[in-house]
Amino acid sequence: MARYTGPRVRVSRRIGFNVFENRKGDKALQDRPYPPGENGRKRARETDYGTQLKEKQKVRYMYGVLEKQFRNYYKEASRMNGITGENLLILLESRLDNVIYRAGFASTRPQARQLVSHRHFKLNGKFVDVPSHQVKAGDVIEIKNASQDLIVIQHTIDTGQDYVVPSWLDVDNKKKTVKTVSYTHLRAHETTRY
């Protein structure tokens, strides 16, 4: 599936939030906390539609999903039982790249996406190289043996020791495995880390 490859800091400044979780975006928002462009400082009053659009774009860029894929997630969430917004959150949080990010094996979602694409992880003993793969409750994700000593993964695990793993994940840093327990905790809006 495709991904966004355009200017990241510009998008973060437009939205007013560092959606790509990089240091460059933090610094740019600190130095220039206004939208990019010639008329960026002259901010017009935001309408309700503008606020809703900005929040949708924030979620879309955070999870690395393009517009059509996001629309498909929304359609699927509206068909499911329950509140559509919560269902959408569950669908986005249960993506394989997001589960790896939430488990603390990657420092950002784009990094998790790349690690999945390069086949560094197994899902229930089989290689999966699709970042948007939906992880179900009870699935076990493990780092393949040849990738266990990758500097990127090791550094993220070492530096993220104080990171609180969500309760819907069971992480074993010694075996380098993750098991999804249940997504019911997500209904209570438990998101510990953007």
What are these regions (language model features)?
Residues 194:
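Post-transcriptional modification and biogenesis factors for structured RNAs
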Residues 121-161:
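S4-like RNA-binding module at protein N-termini
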Residues 68-99:
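Ordered, amphipathic secondary-structure segments that act as subunit-interaction surfaces
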Residues 90-137:
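A basic, amphipathic helix-loop patch mediating RNA/tRNA/ribosome contacts
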Residues 156-179, 187:
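Non-DNA-binding regulatory cores of transcription-related proteins
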Residues 184-191:
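Conserved small/polar residues in nucleotide/adenosyl-binding loops
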Residues 23, 124, 180:
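Residue-level signature of catalytic and energy-coupling elements of molecular machines
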Residues 1-64, 71-74:
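Intrinsically disordered, Lys/Arg-rich N-terminal extensions and targeting peptides
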